[in-house]
């Protein structure tokens, strides 16, 4: 499995704001969108293009346009914070949803909803899950996507923990993870340290 940490001054600046416990909900949402834009730009670097003839105002020329079929699948609800930025850069992307809920007492995820486009085998599938902590939610979603034909899923996470990475290496070795940071590890409640808290709660003000 490939883990790619996106190193860029703008990523560091956005991450600093997301980590700050005093960042208000509205600012947190804007920062999440910016983080998504930066991660998506890196994660789509190798998408397939095709030559296309056009006319500029001055002369005919050949340009390259995106031809890859792209599917974005946010994990409800936290993954919704990455969807706006994704669609801003890839507006033609199809969108699916995986509803996953973590039992806070056991940190075990359960799947309660799924609605994804058909024929995932011929698509480049991006899973949007901003916090890769234990890896349970991501592994469950990737398993579900694989059952529907997806191969080589690209996981976009703002912060990852070594424990979550290790779990995916064992269960989903063909996945590529794009993240802004790999943090120290998990606490006894399975939250990432130093992390940024509960992403979904901070995104939605709950």
For each predicted feature, which ranges?
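PRPP-associated nucleotide enzymes
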Residues: 1-206
């Amino acid at each position: 499995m490939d883990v790619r940490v996106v190193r860029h001054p703008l990523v560091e600046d956005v991450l600093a704001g997301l980590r700050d416990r005093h960042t208000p909900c509205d600012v947190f949402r804007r920062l999440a969108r910016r983080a998504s834009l930066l991660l998506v730009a890196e994660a789509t670097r190798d998408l397939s293009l095709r030559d296309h003839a056009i006319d500029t105002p001055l002369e005919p020329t050949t340009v390259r346009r995106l031809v890859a079929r792209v599917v974005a699948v946010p994990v409800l609800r936290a993954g919704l914070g990455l969807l706006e930025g994704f669609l801003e850069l890839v507006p033609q992307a199809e969108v699916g949803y995986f509803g996953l809920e973590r039992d806070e007492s056991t940190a075990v995820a359960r799947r309660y909803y799924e609605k994804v486009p058909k024929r995932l085998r011929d698509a480049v599938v991006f899973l949007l899950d901003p916090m890769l902590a234990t890896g349970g939610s991501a592994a469950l979603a990737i398993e579900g996507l694989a059952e529907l034909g997806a191969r080589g899923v690209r996981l976009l996470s703002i912060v990852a923990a070594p424990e979550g990475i290790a779990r995916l290496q064992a269960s989903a070795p063909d996945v590529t993870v794009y993240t802004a940071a790999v943090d120290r590890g998990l606490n006894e409640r399975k939250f990432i340290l130093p992390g940024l808290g509960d992403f979904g709660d901070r995104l939605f003000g709950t």
